[in-house]
Amino acid sequence: MAYPGHPGAGGGYYPGGYGGAPGGPAFPGQTQDPLYGYFAAVAGQDGQIDADELQRCLTQSGIAGGYKPFNLETCRLMVSMLDRDMSGTMGFNEFKELWAVLNGWRQHFISFDSDRSGTVDPQELQKALTTMGFRLSPQTVNSVAKRYSTSGKITFDDYIACCVKLRALTDSFRRRDSGQQGVVNFSYDDFIQCVMTV
């Protein structure tokens, strides 16, 4: 079974991790990664950022464009999506991965915001999710749309929160679906951990 954002699936807005030295030049004469300046401006001495720092970093970088800056809860979701060691923080390589994903999702949002209102409606969300490779029932899409819309409109921030949660839950499901059959068995505790850490 193909999963959205993974090899064999349509869409492909979820690039993999990045190797190499965080931010700084690896060899004399090599230039510093331009994203490192945004990251280093808010990172502590441990070289990690938490959700508060990520929110400041993304706001200062202007990645949201003309849209409202990301709220703290959306930033918490972003950190948890990439927090593989469950530390509540992300390093520079995870930040670079997030940056690439956010840019892809932003372009995707813009392409579905046909009236340039800064929002998408539930039907546009359904089309967007389908083009990203998510094969969800109409009932599930309706539930997702209700969860992330206000007065029938989904803002950029809520769209990103929705994408982050869908990716994180799909990744968690995929890790447990070793036979790639689209079906897994969860213990209650495992289910709660899976859902609450997203």
Swiss-Prot record:
- Ligand binding (Ca(2+) 1): 83, 85, 87, 89, 94
Q: Which residues form the EF-hand domain?
A: 45-64, 70-98, 100-135, 151-169
Q: Which residues bind Ca(2+) 2?
A: 113, 115, 117, 119, 124
Any idea which GO molecular function terms this record carries? calcium ion binding; DNA-binding transcription factor binding; protease binding; protein heterodimerization activity; protein sequestering activity; transcription regulator inhibitor activity
At which residues is Phosphoserine found?
A: 178
Membrane topology type: Peripheral membrane protein
Q: Which GO terms describe its cellular component?
A: chromaffin granule membrane; cytosol; extracellular exosome; nucleoplasm; plasma membrane; sarcoplasmic reticulum membrane; vesicle; Z disc
Q: Which GO terms describe its biological process?
A: calcium ion transport; negative regulation of cardiac muscle contraction; negative regulation of heart rate; positive regulation of release of sequestered calcium ion into cytosol; regulation of cardiac muscle cell contraction; regulation of cell communication by electrical coupling involved in cardiac conduction; regulation of insulin secretion involved in cellular response to glucose stimulus; regulation of relaxation of muscle
Q: Which UniProt keywords apply?
A: Calcium, Cytoplasm, Membrane, Metal-binding, Phosphoprotein, Repeat, Sarcoplasmic reticulum
Subcellular localization, per the record?
Cytoplasm; Sarcoplasmic reticulum membrane
Q: Which PROSITE patterns match?
A: EF_HAND_1, EF_HAND_2
The record's section on Pfam families has: EF-hand_7, EF-hand_8
UniProt cross-references to Gene3D superfamilies, sorted A to Z: 6.10.140.900, EF-hand
User: What tissues has this protein been observed in?
Assistant: Detected in cardiac myocytes.
Q: Does the keyword Cytoplasm apply?
A: yes
What's the miscellaneous note?
Answer: This protein has been shown to bind calcium with high affinity.
Q: What does this protein do?
A: Calcium-binding protein that modulates excitation-contraction coupling in the heart. Contributes to calcium homeostasis in the heart sarcoplasmic reticulum. Modulates the activity of RYR2 calcium channels.
Q: How does it assemble?
A: Homodimer. Interacts with GCA, RYR2 and ANXA7.
The identity of this protein, by name, is: Sorcin
